[in-house]
Amino acid sequence: MASPSKAVIVPGNGGGDVTTHGWYGWVKKELEKIPGFQCLAKNMPDPITARESIWLPFMETELHCDEKTIIIGHSSGAIAAMRYAETHRVYAIVLVSAYTSDLGDENERASGYFTRPWQWEKIKANCPYIVQFGSTDDPFLPWKEQQEVADRLETKLHKFTDCGHFQNTEFHELITVVKSLLKVPA
């Protein structure tokens, strides 16, 4: 598989400008310091409900996620990355605050991601590198679901106890992970 030439940040749902929300803009800026590497962080269509039927085609046709892409997905974006990798080859997925069910939430149910079983083996077959960040004190996601993603996908899990839903403004550990995937010194 060819070495990656870009990262794509797929944000969590909720709206707002992706480049100024949380760590997304900071990560984009840091990754673009790597020579010859591009990082896309675009506002997603349907940002509140984050419907699979809208997000996955956007990831394919507008963000051009392919086998030279590292998809960095946060929350709903992590779910989109996993569903995308069920049917598309990508270089890597980096999952931040990933989960496996609609959490009993009406908006999550409406997104369409949770209407069928996960195809864990297809994700692993289409994606040679899977890294995960999760925190036991996430106020929105039970640790059990984050651990299930780690177990089913055999991710390289970075487990924290104090990062909540990873809504900070910088994310140094993520930069280190992407650089290791690129074999660039940290």
UniProtKB/Swiss-Prot annotation:
Keywords: Hydrolase
Pfam families found in the cross-reference section: Ser_hydrolase
GO BP term, example: xenobiotic metabolic process
A Gene Ontology term for the protein's cellular component: nucleoplasm
Reactions this protein catalyses: valacyclovir + H2O = acyclovir + L-valine + H(+)
Example GO molecular function: serine hydrolase activity
Family per record: Belongs to the RBBP9 family.
Further comment found in the protein's record: Plays a role in maintaining pluripotency in human stem cells in vitro.
Subunit details: Interacts with RB1; the interaction disrupts RB1 binding to E2F1. Interacts with RBL1 and RBL2.
Protein name, UniProt field: Serine hydrolase RBBP9
Organism: Homo sapiens
Organismal lineage: Eukaryota, Metazoa, Chordata, Craniata, Vertebrata
